[in-house]
Design a protein with these regions (language model features):
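Conserved catalytic core of nucleotide-sugar-dependent glycosyltransferases
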Residues: 35-124
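Non-transmembrane alpha-helical segments in soluble domains
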Residues: 13-16, 104, 138
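Glycine-rich phosphate-binding loop signature in dinucleotide/nucleotide-binding domains
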Residues: 19-23
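Active-site-proximal specificity loops/subdomain of glycosyltransferases
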Residues: 1-18
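Short aromatic/hydrophobic "clamp" motif used to bind/position activated sugar donors
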Residues: 25, 31
Length: 203
């Protein structure tokens, strides 16, 4: 696949192929560290034992709406005005392994070609403005028949992002301060806030 971002998105949409014996797949980005051991309730609803899929209503005119709403609706086959929620709300999103294949097959039937081709063309036609794998998986589940596979808490953006992880943008590499903050958290020496206080705030 010629575009690196398109390739990593497609890679995540094929996560099931990497772990054939797993029942579920939990995604945590490579620029993210956990701030404590995960509890079952961080990932699954304790009552239903289904993966948590927090959803946040799109704010009209917001960056999230402008960036994700139309392309997500196009990818999953619904009207943009019917897509009320965003689903890329936090790190630690989890999906049943079988769900990925269901999504890929449905997307390929809808668009009449391999999903990898659709992603490459999307990148080319928009000069690199991507679809989001997590927005697409969430929207497909909510609007196209997968609601029974997840628990759907409707939350605010702040509550949705309360997953115990620290994510720092690393596209430009790790500078000295950021590296020290991440090493501090990984070492378990302190909380993220204390690590940042001692080393200087990292945005």
């Amino acid at each position: 696949m010629p575009h690196a971002d398109a390739a990593q998105i497609f890679d995540k949409l094929c996560a099931d192929l990497y772990v054939p014996a797993a029942r579920f797949v939990l995604h945590i980005d490579s620029d993210t560290v956990l701030t404590r051991p995960l509890a079952f309730s961080d990932v699954f609803d304790p009552r239903t034992r289904k993966p948590l899929m927090p959803r946040v209503r799109y704010a009209p005119g917001s960056e999230a709406e402008l960036r994700w709403r139309a392309v997500t609706a196009d990818l999953v086959g619904i009207e943009a005005e019917d897509l009320e929620f965003q689903f890329m709300t936090r790190q630690g999103l989890c999906y049943p392994r079988a769900f990925y294949g269901t999504f890929r097959r449905a997307a390929e039937r809808l668009h009449g070609r391999p999903l990898s081709e659709w992603l490459v063309d999307r990148f080319a036609s928009t000069k690199g403005h991507p679809a989001s794998e997590f927005e697409a998986l969430g929207a497909f589940a909510y609007y196209r028949g997968g609601r029974d596979q997840f628990a759907w808490p409707a939350v605010t953006q702040n509550a949705a992002s309360s997953f115990p992880a620290l994510q720092k943008l690393s596209w430009g590499g790790l500078d000295t301060t950021l590296r020290l903050v991440l090493e501090c958290v990984i070492a378990g020496a302190s909380t993220p806030g204390n690590c940042e206080t001692g080393l200087g705030k990292v945005s």
